[in-house]
Amino acid sequence: MKTQTLQKIKGYAYDKFSCYKGCQHGLDHALRVVNNAKRMVKILKVEKRIDVNLLYASCWLHDIAVIDKNNNVISSLYFHFFESSINKKHIRRVLERFPLSKSEFQTIVNAIINHPHSIPYRSLNRNGDIYLKILQDADSFDYISDERLKSFNSNRWYLTPISNLYICLVKKNIKYFLNYPELAKYIDQF
């Protein structure tokens, strides 16, 4: 993928996410997922085997469908359970704005549709392509990040003890929620 195309995708994500008021899937989340993916590329030593721009584009857009939902409990639950289906309907329209090859288009679509639910459902993609696997693991590491936990707890103080315990348990067992379980030993870098 051309760097120009990645910059257009990044700009689009910035514009869209800057308007979104949800605490769990905003611009900060997308940026953390991109940074997690960058760390993983280095740890896994795959820089020369993949198109990193294509990976980062997938990371920037992986939750773009969430900005079209209402920010309430019912809408959030619906989105959580049907995220793959919602992404499937939404992502193609988004990607048509950008000059992508057919292969780039399909790689991003596949990664975004199939990335949800490693945590808590262990719906992994170990047989998927590297773009999907890294995106899913980068998103999983953000799921257990201190920043995201603080964000969650700030709006739901009454759930703080339960959410803290839950995240602690997931962190201790993170290797079971990753396509690349060897990344678990680097948990402090994410």
Where are these regions (language model features)?
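Alpha-helix N-cap/helix-initiation sites
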Residues: C23-G26, K48-L54, S101-F105
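An active-site-proximal "capping" alpha-helix that borders the catalytic cofactor pocket
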Residues: V33-M40, H80-R97
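Inter-helical turn/loop segments and adjacent helix faces that build the functional surface
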Residues: L44-E47, V94-K102
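His-Asp-centered metal-binding catalytic motifs of divalent-metal-dependent phosphohydrolases/nucleases
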Residues: I50-F79, E83, N87, V109-H117, ...
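Internal catalytic-core helix/loop-beta-alpha segment
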Residues: K102-L124
